[in-house]
Design a protein with these regions (language model features):
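N-terminal leader/targeting and accessory segments in enzymes
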Residues: 1-95
Length: 95
């Protein structure tokens, strides 16, 4: 099964290894990517710099409402599935 993500708005929750890889892959396939991570530490700061240098929009240290302006979410494996933002995204029919 394939899914064309070109021109889709994709939010990625988590800015560790898998989030960075997902952001790069989605961007290379023509998606409009936004990455958000609540945690702000050395790793997320480094990854933030790497992605923004490649014109991928990111935020760290908070989740703004921009995360909900999306067609599709990719949730990193380390992010708990029962947090409020995920429940809100589901209620908005974000896949």
């Amino acid at each position: 099964m394939s899914f064309n993500i070109a021109n889709k708005k994709i939010t990625i929750i988590g800015l560790q290894k898998s989030g960075v890889a997902a952001a790069q892959l989605a961007s290379m396939n023509g998606a409009h990517v936004f990455v958000s991570d609540l945690i702000e530490n050395e790793i997320t700061k480094k990854n933030y710099q790497e992605l923004t240098k490649n014109n991928i929009n990111c935020e760290i240290g908070k989740h703004t409402d921009q995360i909900f302006e999306s067609d599709l979410w990719v949730i990193s494996p380390g992010v708990p599935k029962n947090i409020k933002i995920i429940k809100k995204a589901e209620s908005l029919d974000i896949q």
